[in-house]
Amino acid sequence: MLTKFETKSNRVKGLSFHPRRPWILASLHSGVIQMWDYRMGTLLDRFDEHDGPVRGVHFHATQPLFVSGGDDYKIKVWNYKTHRCLFTLHGHLDYIRTVQFHHEYPWIVSASDDQTIRIWNWQSRTCVAVLTGHNHYVMCASFHPKEDLVVSASLDQTVRVWDIGALRKKTVSPADDILRLTQMNTDLFGGVDAVVKYVLEGHDRGVNWASFHPTLPLIVSGADDRQVKLWRMNDTKAWEVDTLRGHMNNVSCVMFHAKQDIIVSNSEDKSIRIWDATKRTGIQTFRREHDRFWILSAHPEMNLLAAGHDSGMIVFKLERERPAFSVSGDTVFYVKDRFLRFFEFTTQKEVQLAPIRRPGSVSLNQSPKTLSYSPTENAVLICSDVDGGSYELYIVPKDSAGRADYLQDAKKGAGGSAVFVARNRFAVLEKSSNQVLVKNLKNEIVKKSPLPIATDAIYYAGTGNLLCKAEDRVTIFDLQQRLILGELQAPSVKYVVWSSDMESVALLSKHAVVIANKKLVHRCTLHETIRVKSGAWDENGVFIYTTLNHIKYCLPNGDSGIIKTLDVPIYITRVIGNNIFCLDRDGKNKLVTVDASEYIFKLALLRKRYDHVMSMIKNSQLCGQAVISYLQQKGFPEVALHFVKDEKTRFNLALESGNIQIAVASAKEIDDKDHWYRLGIEALRQGNVGIVEYAYQRTKNFERLAFLYLITGYMDKVGFMCKIAGQNNNLMGQFHNALYLGDALKRVEILENAGQLPLAYITATTHGLTEIADRLAAELGENIPSLPEGKARSLLIPPAPLTASGDWPLLRVMHGIFEGGLDATGKAELEEDDEAAGADWGDEDLDMVDASEAMANGGDGFDAEEGEANEEDGEEGGWDLEDLELPPEAETPKNAGNARSAVFVAPPPGMPVSLIWTQKSSLAGEHAAAGNFDTAMRLLSRQLGIKNFAPLKPLFVDLHMGSHSYLRALATAPIIPIAVEKGWSESASPNVRGPPALVFTFPQMEDRLKAAYKATTDGKFPEALRQFLSILHTIPLIVVDSRREVDEVKELIEIVREYVLGLRMELKRKELRDDVNRQQELAAYFTNCKLQRVHMRLVLGSAMGLCYKQKNFATAEHFARMLLENNPNEAQARRARQVQQQCSGKKDSSELNYDYRNPFVVCGATYVPIYRGQKDVSCPYCGSRFVPSIEGQLCTICELAVVGADASGLLCSPTQSR
């Protein structure tokens, strides 16, 4: 059983498939009818007008109707498009068990517990026949698919077949029937239009279900005696053929399969059983743990069944319908009707090659599952689930094409899956041992190879390679070298599709498509809500795949879309241009022609083949919101512009692409305040002053307009704005403009007119306007405000705009491939005079006038050519400015900037100093100073094997910042970085560049070393360790001038390494409080480090005292002797001699891992001695030694390099590379 869909609900008592749509009706014991889309797995609708359980439900074959019958004695006919019940049929006197539409006539047959069967005309909404004769509940009734018969089953232990031929004749030619019974008589005694033809007796208990065979004169029935009986009938009689036994409880429902010779039954024993209708034997049984089955339904066209049970229903198939096929070159090989066939794509010729052996068993799902073809040997491998998984090898002679009688003995073998891996070799998966067997064409094992992962299936992955599928991932396995060539996380892969060049692979699972390259490096993943069925690569590298109801595409970057909607699932075999070759579920080759222009267009954009894009824009009918949205998302709004006619969309795209001209044209058409506002913002961002001015004029945003005039230096226009504000009685606007102008007299006048005499007096007095101040003082009388004494006065005037000009100069850029010529109107609007305009964007030929002139003409519209009447004149008389003496008409933005701006030509860029620094340098410090951190890291990795760059990050930043100086310029200009060179002088040639001046130098390292020595002497071990490590981390980035200094740097590394090792051991020793032996060993190893003599004396004294305390007298005596050899001071010498005397001739109380007689070095990670002659590995940078097991790990001394890594060596001077 292949479950396609499952629901959880109350007990399902009735089921019905829609004949064409992927819908199923389920009627529940709770009284609800559900309509599901079983393909998408969604609940489409629910209908709940019945009172009590609904036991019968059925779709009409052609109309948007379904019928239902329930325990409320009602039959309801529904229209699922309008979601309502059309009418209710009354007549039954007890529960209604089943209802069914006639396939041709407007009839409904219903079976009821009132012991009758009724036939209704749903068009006239009347009962046309009552079939009486059963003497117990009638459990089901159904029409014959072709003849005028009805079959019914009843708890009176009989199955009855009724002849309704007379009813049909009366319906076809309704004549006045003088003997026609009244409706009451029909209800009581039944009509004469339907008579019993056969009564089938044989069941020992009540019969629950009976149904006709779709084509043969057979009936199948199931009863409470747990038996399924098969009956045959002819024109005169009917008889029992056989009895199928196996159910353990009442048989609820039974029916013939529409396309196969099988019978399907279900029962209250919680099982569904499949029977062979010809051999009358059980084939398969499917069980549920807790749910009894009540109803079955078969799809009239497709190979689908549904079963209702106590907690829902399931939609399932009995067998896979996917044909086994393999594409090779221009041919597809496939299996159909137990024959191996091939189909040529170019000639579209289908040829039958050879018959395929039928499986011996009668169980389901024995058809071929996969097929693999070897073109050189003309051999075919067919795998199936026969005998738990097996394969058959056919070698087809060249001359056998078309000979259906040709039959050969296939070479067989057991195996989960089998594929060809070479010309005459194939691989077979042996699941039990998780190994692959390589066999020749004689079916002999040539080689066995264990697989690297627990493999469920194998697929071809190139000659000699297998793609192994596990539950959660796939790997490519080289059979010859037994190596994994690639691995990818991809759960539950079902199919693998390689491109023709074997460079790309698509991994298809139930609801996902994963695209990867030939080494299984992930490219993209697509997730689908419904099942993915098949796929193939087209010649452009686009993957075309199918789901249950769509053909879709996937571009190399993961973008996808729908090409075509499907009615039935198909399996793609080949894609050639606009033609998709495929197989359907019946194994027929089909050709589907599609429009590939959408994905070809997107692919050309992705690959930047703009000539193709331009050609497609001009010649094809690409349109629609999806293409526009895609272009916008991918950063091509200028291309999307040429598809758009809607002005609002054009405006948005024009702003996004920075195309001010089209934005202005669209804003004029829309003429909406919000769009002018947005246009102003974009024009301001581009520095296009003329357009900004025009946008502010259209929105009457006079405050912004006045400020724009101020910052661009048009002070005369600020004066006009002041007059306009005065005419509008806008005191604040008037005062702001007077402030912008620095006109104190005007400000006094405005304040006086506003009645603010004290403020006017203060302003006049402050600015030295004594006459006006005296006049105002006389008016104020005693209310004269007092001015603060001793404070200096200052003139309130805005600074003069230094960069006052028209439009900002913009760098000239290359025209995009899409600019110009794509549509006639766009070309006319966008035509430019390049020579005249240069980079000054103030030259657009726009219909604009000055704000003052616009005010004079009515104030609403600023477009003089539009000639529009002022729509707001009647309401806003305060805008009337006719009496003003205004200057001549302001210039449009075309000439807005020409008075002060000239053609701007950007200077050619030179080579950055940082690039000069790194061109011929192999020194990591200089690359870091130039800001090329990635190349610096690569150099350090190659030279010193450094892998951990975290400690070097702040040093890189310090080097880069320290080798540059930064110069602030104007507020509108960016900060200018200046490279600081080593040995720079004014007399140097500008074409000769020196190396960068580095902040880290070798003398600095010597100063740090002295500080670290002092911290060590003072016993500040953590601080000393930090300082030594800072030296070790900085050394790779310093640069010295001579070979002698290079040697000194290398010597410094050795010194620091010894101290870091010793200090780490000492800090480790102090952490160990309980392990006294390990404490003594670490103290002893510290004495083996090469230290300064002053520090060596301290270390020896510490080790001597520790060993003496723990009664290791021999070792303590050794340390005392070494201390005396290192010129100790008087106190140290006295102490050493005392220990020597006490320990003379005594032995150690415990054995230490320390032999001072045998030369050794200490492992920097494990702190154990590595004696001479033992194997070790070293750090490529600091030279620390380690036991071999540490190889490949990070060095614990320098914390930078990888132990045992290959490296060329320290490079810290230009002299080393000469």
From Swiss-Prot:
Keywords from the named record: Cytoplasm, Cytoplasmic vesicle, ER-Golgi transport, Golgi apparatus, Membrane, Protein transport, Repeat, Transport, WD repeat
Coiled coil: none
Any Pfam family hit: COPI_C
Region annotation (Disordered) ranges: 857-882
Protein name: Coatomer subunit alpha-1
Biased segments, Acidic residues type: 862-882
Single Gene Ontology BP annotation: retrograde vesicle-mediated transport, Golgi to endoplasmic reticulum
Compartments where located: Cytoplasm; Golgi apparatus membrane; Cytoplasmic vesicle, COPI-coated vesicle membrane
A GO molecular-function annotation: structural molecule activity
Membrane topology listed for this record: Peripheral membrane protein
Function of the molecule: The coatomer is a cytosolic protein complex that binds to dilysine motifs and reversibly associates with Golgi non-clathrin-coated vesicles, which further mediate biosynthetic protein transport from the ER, via the Golgi up to the trans Golgi network. Coatomer complex is required for budding from Golgi membranes, and is essential for the retrograde Golgi-to-ER transport of dilysine-tagged proteins.
Chief location: cytoplasm
GO CC field: COPI vesicle coat; Golgi membrane
PROSITE patterns per the UniProt record, alphabetical: WD_REPEATS_1, WD_REPEATS_2, WD_REPEATS_REGION
Entry-linked InterPro entries: Beta-prop_COPA/B_2nd, Coatomer_alpha_WD-assoc_reg, Coatomer_asu, Coatomer_asu_C, Coatomer_complex_subunit, G-protein_beta_WD-40_rep, TPR_COPA_B, WD40/YVTN_repeat-like_dom_sf
Lineage: Eukaryota, Viridiplantae, Streptophyta, Embryophyta, Tracheophyta
Organism: Oryza sativa subsp. japonica (Rice)
The keyword Protein transport is annotated on this UniProt entry: yes
Residue stretches of each WD repeat: 7-48, 49-88, 91-132, 133-172, 202-241, 246-285, 288-326, 363-404, 450-489
